Swiss-Prot record:
It is a multi-pass membrane protein. The chain crosses the membrane at residues 43-63, 68-88, 96-116, 150-170. It comes from the Eukaryota. It comes from Caenorhabditis elegans. Coiled coil: none annotated. The lineage of its organism: Eukaryota, Metazoa, Ecdysozoa, Nematoda, Chromadorea. It is found in: Membrane. Residues 224-237 have a biased composition (Low complexity). The keyword Chaperone does not apply. This is Uncharacterized protein F59B10.4. Its main location: membrane. The keyword Lipoprotein does not apply. GO terms for cellular component: membrane. Keywords: Membrane, Transmembrane, Transmembrane helix. Residues 216-247 are annotated as: Disordered.
Length: 264
């Protein structure tokens, strides 16, 4: 009568194999960061960035304290943000686009303000005063000198401009993702553009693998990637359960630290 042996994988070896509950199936896509973003979170995030959006109005108020231009621009900014939030809730992409363009304009303004602030730090105050005296009638340089004087008067202006630029960039990214999700849902939900999880251990290990020494998950994944891909019409490769029973007739088992041999 033939002798049969039951080979059970070692628990220490089997602990390296991720379970099916912990690892997604092959081909399952991971949702993007902004695909599952709740509309309420977008509303709260955009509302919290209103102070950063209003920095340009504060700068204009410091330069022109008696003008109605800062107040008008603040109202316009608030209206566009509110319109974008209503568009996100009602899923109307045309209501988000004006706010997105407005954010890009504000980003350019803050970058311009940051460059002037850095230039003002490099020029001493005496040089600025001499420039005012030597060029009193040149109108093209007047606005530039006003911004430089403002940057020299408020030393924290460059740091505030950098912080508000980062906030505006994040807000513009959120608005663009919301607009893209509403306007082009097929592009956002395209599985080819999403990251896919690696295949499970069972899909990598072939049925003809050596029963004496099961490979690790990294080795099985490497061997599976080196195999030629099958055609789309062909069925998926047969998978083997994590705890398979193998029968080897009339074979004496070799000593192995990876396997536990039970004689029947």
């Amino acid at each position: 009568m033939a002798n049969y042996h039951l080979m059970v994988p070692n628990p220490s070896r089997n602990a390296q194999i991720p379970s099916e509950a912990q690892r997604p199936m092959y081909g399952e896509s991971h949702p993007s960061l902004f695909a599952n973003m709740n509309n309420k979170k977008v509303v709260v995030a955009a509302a919290c960035t209103l102070p950063a959006d209003s920095l340009f109005a504060v700068m204009l108020y410091l330069i022109y304290p008696d003008s109605f231009l800062p107040s008008t621009l603040f109202i316009v900014n608030f209206s566009l943000v509110l319109l974008a939030l209503l568009g996100i809730n009602s899923k109307v992409s045309s209501m988000i686009l004006p706010a997105l363009v407005w954010k890009c304009v504000l980003l350019l303004f803050l970058l311009f303000l940051g460059c002037i602030s850095v230039d003002a730090y490099q020029v001493p105050a005496t040089d600025l005063e001499e420039a005012h005296v030597s060029q009193p009638q040149e109108q093209p340089h007047r606005s530039m000198m006003v911004w430089k004087d403002l940057a020299a008067k408020y030393p924290m202006l460059p740091f505030i401009a950098v912080a508000c630029t980062i906030v505006l960039a994040v807000e513009a990214r959120v608005f663009f993702s919301a607009w893209q999700k509403i306007c082009c849902p097929a592009v956002v939900n395209d599985e080819s553009n999403l990251e896919k999880s690696p295949p499970s251990y069972n899909a990598c290990v072939r049925a003809t693998a050596s029963e004496k020494d099961l490979p690790s998950y990294e080795d099985a994944l490497k061997n599976s990637s080196q195999q030629p891909s099958t055609s789309s019409s062909s069925s998926s490769p047969p998978s083997r359960p994590p705890h398979s029973v193998y029968t080897i007739p009339d074979v004496k088992m070799h000593k192995s630290s990876m396997m536990t041999v039970i004689s029947l």
